[in-house]
Amino acid sequence: MNLKSDRLLIGHFKRADLQEWFLIERDPSVRKYILDGSVLNEEQSLAYIEQNIASYAKFNFGRYTLRDKKSLRLIGMCGFLNTDMGIDFGYRLSKDMWGYGLGFEAANAVLAYGIKVIGLNHIVAGVMPENLASIKILERLGFIYQTDVIYERKTYHKYMFSSNKN
């Protein structure tokens, strides 16, 4: 999978991405709204990459790398994860990339790819209520708030996107 947006190159995770990915995953600001907020160590970062590599093979989707088109630096991820609640949509960016509209740019491109190329119809997203930037992105993409859910003792807003608007 090689997808491009105006400022991003979007592709599959590879084991060679470990050092760049670890720099993102060890930042407490980036991890603040993810599960318990714990940063990942290098071993956990590699496990995350391997989980996505396995997901590409098994489901034909996963979380994808986001690279800056100019520098080719790995700056985040965006994509899909098969979960008990359905196909989950998620994204995150390196803190130095916040505030430039890259979250929406990536999410818009990857969501369109998921619908048009992979054929996904119903997609869920869980977001902590205080993560206003992510809520704004989801709502701008057309995700609709469904309910609040408790996961690992934290409250999340559950959003749903359906490509079948009937």
Model-predicted regions and their roles:
Residues 53-65:
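A short helix-loop-beta-strand connector motif used in the catalytic cores of GNAT acetyltransferases and
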